[in-house]
């Protein structure tokens, strides 16, 4: 997989960088694995906006992805690599030997015709799913379960992977993409390898319209609003915030405030906290 750049024929193509989609082998999704989905557009059950800057975008069909990998000891072959509009990773369509079809997250390097399998005693190969207790130290994994049988909940984004660091008792230590080291039960399943489509981090949408196609509406800075709309608003010209630090539209501290509870029960499973990301490297906007 590679990325594609464009000549500056228009302002929208000047900075546009996209993946070339050459790894995709099927244009239409498997009909038995798609369902219609009503998009909430950032609203809750009362119609109140709970997540700003969401709405519009192209119509989508939701692909049913197998995060549990609970079809043990039944081999499957990779039939196709498909696009998924709901995530930045690709999907691998599996044809099981008993005739069932399922989607899984496509690992990096997986090929058409490759055989994958899940179970407690399966070969150590990319795409195979097994308990953390059976995975060698130093291996890269993705789609990691946080609770046994619930399905993969962590490390599912494109290019992401976690590393098996140590095993002790009933727990396995994983180094997550955030650099946090966390203990997870040894019976939890994970898939070997890293998630594919890692070049997505080097892409650029190029224009505002392409962002609208994805269902993202404009983000207006608080400093250009009126005082009745945002704590940063008002003043003559480019006025400063007027507070000790930036705040959200509801007056809560923004950009750097820790929101995790100090006495959260799961803190005992965190061996090393994640690295703090500076404001400059985060590239955040005025709230």
Swiss-Prot record:
GO molecular function, a single term: transferase activity
GO terms (BP aspect): translation
Superkingdom of the organism of origin: Bacteria
Stretches assigned to coiled coil: none
Keyword Zinc-finger (UniProt): no
Extent of Basic residues compositional bias: 258-287
Positions of region (Disordered): 221-287
Keyword Ribonucleoprotein set for record: yes
Keywords noted in UniProt: Ribonucleoprotein, Ribosomal protein, RNA-binding, rRNA-binding
GO cellular component entries: large ribosomal subunit
Chain's role: One of the primary rRNA binding proteins. Required for association of the 30S and 50S subunits to form the 70S ribosome, for tRNA binding and peptide bond formation. It has been suggested to have peptidyltransferase activity; this is somewhat controversial. Makes several contacts with the 16S rRNA in the 70S ribosome.
Subunit structure: Part of the 50S ribosomal subunit. Forms a bridge to the 30S subunit in the 70S ribosome.
Family according to the record: Belongs to the universal ribosomal protein uL2 family.
Name of the protein this chain belongs to: Large ribosomal subunit protein uL2
Origin species: Prochlorococcus marinus (strain MIT 9211)
Origin organism lineage: Bacteria, Bacillati, Cyanobacteriota, Cyanophyceae, Synechococcales
């Amino acid at each position: 997989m590679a990325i594609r750049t464009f000549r500056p024929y228009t302002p929208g193509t000047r900075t546009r960088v996209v993946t070339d989609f050459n790894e995709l082998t099927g244009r239409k999704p498997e009909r038995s694995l798609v369902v219609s989905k009503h998009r909430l557009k950032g609203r809750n059950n009362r119609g109140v906006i709970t997540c700003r800057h969401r709405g519009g975008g192209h119509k989508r069909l939701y692909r049913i992805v197998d995060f549990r990998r609970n079809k043990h000891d039944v081999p499957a072959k990779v039939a196709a690599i498909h696009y998924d509009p709901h995530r930045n990773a690709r999907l691998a369509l599996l044809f099981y030997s008993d005739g069932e079809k399922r989607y899984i997250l496509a690992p990096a390097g997986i090929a058409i015709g490759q055989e994958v399998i899940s179970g407690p005693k399966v070969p150590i190969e990319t795409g195979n799913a097994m308990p953390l207790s059976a995975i060698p130290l130093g291996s890269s994994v993705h789609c990691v379960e946080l609770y046994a049988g619930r399905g993969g909940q962590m490390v599912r984004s494109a290019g992401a992977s976690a590393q098996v660091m140590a095993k002790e008792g009933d727990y396995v230590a994983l180094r997550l993409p955030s650099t946090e080291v966390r203990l997870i039960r040894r019976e939890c399943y994970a898939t070997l390898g890293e998630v594919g489509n890692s070049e997505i981090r080097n892409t650029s949408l190029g224009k505002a319209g392409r962002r609208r196609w994805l269902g993202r509406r404009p983000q207006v800075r608080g400093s250009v609003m009126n005082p009745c709309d945002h704590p940063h608003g008002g003043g003559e010209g480019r006025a400063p915030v007027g507070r000790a630090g930036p705040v959200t539209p509801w007056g809560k501290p923004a950009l750097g405030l820790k929101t995790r509870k100090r006495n959260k029960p799961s803190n005992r499973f965190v061996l090393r906290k994640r690295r703090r990301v500076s404001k400059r490297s985060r590239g955040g906007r005025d709230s």
